[in-house]
């Protein structure tokens, strides 16, 4: 099996040729270290909220072009072709990379049509690649399979995707985690399935991809076994494949503890995303520091004149995982002022070098995309991903992690430390706990999703009930209108937070009792309806 995506290169040499807009083994011990009229139509609301909108830039055109060039979608069957000139569906791990780009678009937009597309893409993929997957000895393949599926579950709610993502992770982790060599780690390719003469090692690709899957499985199930697995894998990577001084993620380590210190942008990106997930799940700032250090390594060492680019013919994707890792880190931690200009520099180079007939750009972001209809579909996924995470204008500070505090009494919105669907949302004295941390992400219509970092459930109006006094609850994220919120800056610097479906505002009933219910109520402009985002 030829693994072009996984071909190992010494990027001490490659980095010299990188162009366009990112050893020592360590101890196994982890370091410590204006009010608006609630009767406005949805269209009018969209116009009111433009100051908070994450502008799409060229993201819509890029995804539309990607689909025009490669997507086959008919009668519920959907797949990406191997190339423009091909009629054959992309398969296995490469198809997973294609689908991840579509999931990036849905993450940005919340578009119901893209949600349906993702459901059809993954359903078709499972029909073409049914489990069991024990025939595939490459554990990172299973990582990409499972990553596309678990993201798809979080977006569509299709339980079959969760079932198969769990199967994929558990199968690869149970067979791949080995303590005989290197004190742990997941084999890149199972030794007993590796042809004679091929390398046997434990790679960043297999460990980062499966570690990310474990994080998303934990978010989806709250099964602490997955969090323990994610932490175990991460600690091993940190000790064996991560340079904590520079932020470089090494390629792999073999049975004799020989480390391939070659670098790849996708390895950096997977690690960054992984670290950021663990930071959000645990609150441990060391994960944040690791992620930022690895972003800065790419920015300072793996670009030419600021641009990330690689036109190597053997590659499938190059910058897609970095786009996700950087995009999530910057959005969730409100780091736009630090990285936005660099993100836009790359976005502009991507767009300037696109094929204008399809609006698609290959991995070489600093040079014109060839008009070659035989180039693999996955070569164009990284540009699509980057544009989904780079808004057309620098966002304000609403997006990201916040504690939501009442301007009236200083008490915080709290999920009651509950992981149960339908549990009522309450107020509690600010304490810095995960039950009081909420991630704000935006939809294309400029509304906001508000997700608990404790339960990974969404702030929700039960059944879209518009009655004044209805207690708000938490529910599995669906991005339905009863989970979409307008977040409007007021003249005093506070925010009005009101529901798209009901127009009811987040309200504390002018009560300062710990544990008291938070409700919705029609806007009256009182201090009980004004909130600070910390």
Segments from the language model and where they lie:
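Lectin-like carbohydrate-binding module/patch detector with strong preference for beta-trefoil
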Residues: 396-534
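Active-site cradle of extracellular carbohydrate-active enzymes
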Residues: 214, 218, 226-275
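CBM-like carbohydrate-recognition segments
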Residues: 48-101, 105-140, 202, 263, ...
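Bacterial N-terminal signal peptides that target proteins for export
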Residues: 2-16
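Oxyanion-binding "anion nests"
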Residues: 269-282, 290-301
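Short coil/turn linking the two alpha-helices of tandem helical-hairpin repeats
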Residues: 106, 153-157, 218-222, 279, ...
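Bacterial Sec-dependent N-terminal signal peptides
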Residues: 2-5, 22-54
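Extended ligand-binding groove/face enriched in aromatic
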Residues: 115-220, 224-231
